[in-house]
Amino acid sequence: MDPKTSAGQCPVMHGANTTAAQSNTAWWPNALNLDILHQHDTKTNPLGEGYRYREAVKQLDVAALKADLTALMTRSQPWWPADWGHYGGLMIRMAWHAAGSYRVADGRGGAGTGNQRFAPLNSWPDNANLDKARRLLWPIKKKYGAKISWADLIVLAGNVAYESMGLKTYGFAFGREDIWHPEKDIYWGSEKAWLAPTGGEGSRYSGQRDLENPLAAVMMGLIYVNPEGVDGQPDPLKTAQDVRVTFARMAMDDEETVALTAGGHTVGKSHGNGSAANLGPAPEGADVHEQGLGWNNHSSRGIGRDTVTSGIEGAWTTHPTQWDNGYFKLLLGYDWELKKSPAGAWQWEPVGIKEDDKPVDVEDPSIRLNPIMTDADMAMKMDPAYRRISERFAADQAYFSEVFARAWFKLTHRDLGPKSRYIGPEIPAEDLLWQDPVPVGPTAYDVGAVKSRIATSGLSVGELVATAWDSARTWRGSDYRGGANGARIRLAPQKDWAGNEPERLARVLAVLEPIAAAAGASVADVIVLAGNVGVELAAKAAGFDVTVPFAPGRGDATQAQTDVESFEVLEPVADGFRNWQQRSFAVQPEEMLLDRAQLMGLSAPEMTVLVGGLRVLGANHGGSKHGVFTDRVGALTNDFFVTLTDMAHAWVPTGRNSYEIRERASGVVKYTATRADLVFGSNSVLRAYAEVYAQDDSREKFVRDFVAAWVKVMNADRYELQG
């Protein structure tokens, strides 16, 4: 050590280099966070660039894995004993809470990435002690290694848990790929504290309890609703409304909601036999010697019957390790009264219950204890619509089991995408409407002849490109929905979306559909081919001969295969790529552009080159001239970037989201723009990309890069091409 270094000085890295010190966004909170476009790359993946999970998992011995999981369920470990000798309830809660973070509005969250291993989810109050479930799974994950992802294993463990307790599940599909660091793009809410009540700083509620979009949980740190009641105040009818909203935001109807609520609480128990004050920090805040485990109780026994998790204490059913419909028989068969758990949480307990209807203690079968219900459970009895469904399930266990099995499959597979992404021997044969089915399309047609007919159809470059873009831009990598495959742009609701310019769209489709029919091609393929033709014509006008890669085989979905309500969440309210937004929003246009780029799986350079190209192709919504910094509209030039970076121009605000570019010398207005244009000159990172494309030696590079990014967008939903 340098003798000049005092004992109080650090001779190596300072904390600012290794810990979460003040970041650029902390110093400049309004700066655009481009980090959301640069996640989950090969630098963070320890499995290497050549590893392909979707190929590796096909080598998995599924029967052996399921046998090991089944054995795990009843192999209680002394460091975290199984309730009644069965880990089923714990494993189901782990899988449920992984899948339950999904929200349909933006497709983010869910079980598809194994994100429950990382902050913030690994330390949410609602996920307390699920770290123990994952540690119990570790020997199995260790054994099967890279052939099974954590994401798949977590969900499969829940499935096997149900099967081990007597439920015939609907099926299972592999294919979920792990991420290796926390997601940076998911907005979980603005609250500054866990479980912050309504009305506090950053509250997610406004008006008459209107939940902020796209959120699908009532509090920061919860998966769905507060089990004690709205803001911790029991009132089953009020809680019923919270339940209905949160489950709807996961695309569940009332029957699925009742089935999932009851099915999740048919097995296992809630834990609150002690004081939460004795619990240590959550995993992310625990000391190094805790080795990633949180909520450890070093003040009392803290395991088995003395476990504290939610604070509510007790099982819901008489036989918590057995699949049946006893949940409804207790819920509907008894009156219930409010009580406090040993941990001080509100819970409902039955009045005058028969001794035989009580579940036994998790450690001593000679002891029987009251079952409990949460406020959400009581909503299944008190809400009239939920009550009717509950009564039917109580009367028909087979029907309840079937509805639950299907709803559980939907819950755990919704963010896996369409059926073409499913892998494994237990894929259900039935096509389900929520899977957005698309038939296989034809491939044996003359692509060249179709392109020739499109090129001579009289449609402009802008019309060709905009129509293809609108068809493909709905794809989102969060839950693999949307995209050009299926040509749903010609069906309700997409054909009537304002962002798709219905009149222009109908005119273009009237030209393209006969071309498809005559050639024996799908309309979906021809729409993409039309965009490709537009790009090729534009490149030629700029002096470059290019052939845009194309793979036939897209199918045409029918209206019957399209759930109109489900697709409404894919409607764009803004598209910075086409310089359009439906109205003014609290969020700036450039932030909405960035969010769409992230959902589309684009990098910052790809976003940059696509915006610059689409501007000069005349693809703006409604023929807007904003950002069209060229005198050669329809030619794929780098004029957008050349103009943007030219200091001969000055930019002058003319409204909230409108600007003029003026010649500095004369003051003459040359062009107009929006924030979605100017951000490429104002943001230091985006300007660096813009300068590359503005260079004199980058004209061809710009064209090549635009084509590559364009093809990526057009093929985003061609999963059969991706392996």
UniProtKB/Swiss-Prot annotation:
Q: How does it assemble?
A: Homodimer or homotetramer.
Task: Enumerate the cofactors the protein uses.
Answer: heme b
Q: What does this protein do?
A: Bifunctional enzyme with both catalase and broad-spectrum peroxidase activity.
Q: Where does heme b bind?
A: H265
The answer on whether this UniProt entry bears the keyword Cytoplasm reads no
Q: What class of enzyme is it?
A: oxidoreductase
Keywords, in A-Z order: Heme, Hydrogen peroxide, Iron, Metal-binding, Oxidoreductase, Peroxidase
Which residues constitute the cross-link Tryptophyl-tyrosyl-methioninium (Tyr-Met) (with W-96)?
Y224-M250
Residues at the site labelled Transition state stabilizer: R93
State its Enzyme Commission number(s): 1.11.1.21
InterPro entries linked? Catalase_peroxidase, Haem_peroxidase, Haem_peroxidase_sf, Peroxidases_AS
Identify the species of origin.
Answer: Leptothrix cholodnii (strain ATCC 51168 / LMG 8142 / SP-6)
- Post-translational modification summary for this protein: Formation of the three residue Trp-Tyr-Met cross-link is important for the catalase, but not the peroxidase activity of the enzyme.
Instruction: State the protein's name.
Output: Catalase-peroxidase
Q: Name one GO molecular function term.
A: heme binding
What's this protein's family per the entry? Belongs to the peroxidase family. Peroxidase/catalase subfamily.
